[in-house]
Amino acid sequence: MFVRALSLRDFRSWDALGLNLRPGCTVFVGPNGHGKTNVLEALGYLSTLSSHRVSSDAPLIRTGTAQAFAGATVVNTGRELTVDLELNEGKSNRARINQSPTRRPREILGILQTVLFAPEDLSLVRGDPGDRRRYLDELLTSRIPRMAAVRADYERVLRQRSALLKTAGGALRRSSRGGGRPSEDGASALATLEVWDGHLAAHGAQLLAGRLHLVHDLAPHLAESYQSLAPESRPASIRYRSSLGSSLPPEFTAPARAPEAGDIAFLEERFLQELSVMRSKEIERGVCLVGPHRDDLELHLGDTPAKGFASHGESWSFALSLRLAGFALLRADGSDPVLMLDDVFAELDRKRRRALAKVALDAEQVLITAAVPEDVPEELDAVRFGVEARDTDRGRISHILEETEDRRDG
């Protein structure tokens, strides 16, 4: 898979960009803050419908405009598709495939598969569980695009159930102070809660089963990737930690356990069981304490948790290994994703640079950003684009300066 053409309009610092790309290695070179990363961010957004830098779409729309546009023509095993996405301030985003509008933007998921490694990825090791859940879900929907709908349904039900818990909790607190029965609203919320328990368990079981299957497939690639980057270090491993607690047998979340046909039904049953156990605590606190939104991906070096104990170099290697494992998994599924490396070579020592360059050389297409050409390993033959931002009366605008080809002897 490779991106043949990229178009941007009013995306971040780019007022207009039309870029033809090719398989192999392409490097965007320029000072920090001049718009290089915005190019990779746009492609990442077309791939995942989210940014690796911000949690909302507003910063992606260039200041002073109300709409941003990103489009890419993707070639995969000889088949060419063009995906377009409009980001609209205060309105729903719109997407097209080969100029035909889609009902929902998520219908473009799976057309462009990317794996992006950026400095922000250190949060995969050192950050909150939400960073690791997002990593899993983006990789999961890249492999199985229909899981985006499952995740959206789960989040919709979660919001509704959380609102009911707050209503029920507030009503019970007021009635206990007054020595009377729960209000009509509180009683209605309690009666409705059981219905939403069923919806939450149904969608949550599908999402949880998908994540567990993913971790099973991902684990050997992670161990291999980390070994190639840090052969002298302790072995790296991952394990899914579920909020279902004692309702779920420990062996069920073991990465070595192969998924089975009855997993979703089993998980739904255990989900409902744990919701029943936690009902009073959830009402008291007014939040949903059970479900995939409370889970984590545990990272270990040997028997030690990576978070809080790994050195800076080990943390970098683990974060990079998670991305490279995702790349290897998508490749094993049958198609090379586009590999994108955002200003990462400067952060790595010589050994890790060589290991990463080896993967990049083997990818069908790799897009790299660097502040200076010397940050890119010599063994990478690259097409290079210079990038510069200029101050104008319409704000700071990024431009492509020139295209050059580097053919250094490695």
From Swiss-Prot:
Keywords: ATP-binding, Cytoplasm, DNA damage, DNA repair, DNA replication, DNA-binding, Nucleotide-binding, SOS response. It is found in: Cytoplasm. Gene3D superfamilies: P-loop containing nucleotide triphosphate hydrolases, RecF/RecN/SMC, N-terminal domain. The keyword Cell membrane does not apply. The keyword Zinc does not apply. Coiled coil: none annotated. ATP binds at G30, P31, N32, G33, H34, G35, K36, T37. One of its GO terms (cellular component) is cytoplasm. InterPro entries: DNA-binding_RecF (IPR001238), DNA-binding_RecF_CS (IPR018078), P-loop_NTPase (IPR027417), RecF/RecN/SMC_N (IPR003395), RecF_2 (IPR042174). SUPFAM superfamilies: P-loop containing nucleoside triphosphate hydrolases. GO terms for molecular function: ATP binding; single-stranded DNA binding. GO terms for biological process: DNA replication; DNA synthesis involved in DNA repair; double-strand break repair; SOS response. Its main location: cytoplasm. HAMAP family: RecF. Belongs to the RecF family. The RecF protein is involved in DNA metabolism; it is required for DNA replication and normal SOS inducibility. RecF binds preferentially to single-stranded, linear DNA. It also seems to bind ATP. This is DNA replication and repair protein RecF. It comes from Rhodococcus opacus (strain B4). The gene is recF.
